[in-house]
Amino acid sequence: MLSVPGLNKLTVCVLIAVLLAAMAGCQAVALAGVMADTFERTGSHKVYADYKGLEGKSFAVIIAADRVIQGNDSRAITRLTNGIIRKLAASKDVHGANGFVPGVKVLEFQYNKPRWATWSYGRLADEFGVERLIFIDLQEYRLGEPGNAYLWDGVLSGKVGVIEADGMNPDEFAYTKDIRVKYPDQTGVTVNEQNRATVQANLEDRFADRVAWLFFDHEEANMIKY
């Protein structure tokens, strides 16, 4: 979409039509091409929720990761849990959930119950008192290629699953989706060009976006890089 403050897509299209009508021949064709390209590069489009079952329900988000991921960064789960819940909480008027468990409560539970990963999904949902449990199994989290301490090549991936505790099968996922994001977008970015905190923050924010966006309608840039 053309980057014109205060103008919606319909208004922009009408203005384009008026401009083209006032021109003729090659000029009109050239202008149409430029405008179409600008629209594609700077515009956005609506993306509908992949899972709509949060409406009218309470939810919790819990993240599991293997010892390698946790050993490399013991705070990763804390940051991701809070980041994802924060994005979902900020959009509660869109997805329509009627309540959620704060990240600090989930993390406190995980700390106090170190064997929680052996619990059934239904039991976890009951523990939090929610109708929907968003369970995220982190599968890969790295900031660079193994053995290369000089170039950034961040990857964060995981499987998102939703348990419907009030459904017929509270111990089985009613919905699943694989998520994978990368940062930086270009190769060859060195540790001197960007620091660890920047790479980490961008990678985790992209992952949190992709998880949260599964649950509500939203706008995405046409040329989004993740």
Question: Which residues fall in each region the model found?
Answer:
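Bacterial N-terminal signal peptides that target proteins for export
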Residues: M1-V14
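Bacterial N-terminal signal peptides
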Residues: C13-A24
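C-terminal/domain-edge helix-coil "capping" segments
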Residues: C26-G56, L124-F128, W152-V155, G161-Y226
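N-terminal segment of the mature soluble domain
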Residues: E55-Q139, F173-Y175, A201-F215, E219
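Residue-level signal for secondary-structure boundary sites
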Residues: I69, G144, D166-M168
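Short, glycine/charged-enriched secondary-structure capping and boundary segments
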Residues: R75-A76, A149-W152
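Beta-hairpin (beta-strand-turn-beta-strand) motif
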Residues: L138-Y141, I163-A165
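Extracytoplasmic/secreted cell-surface and envelope-processing proteins
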Residues: L143-A149
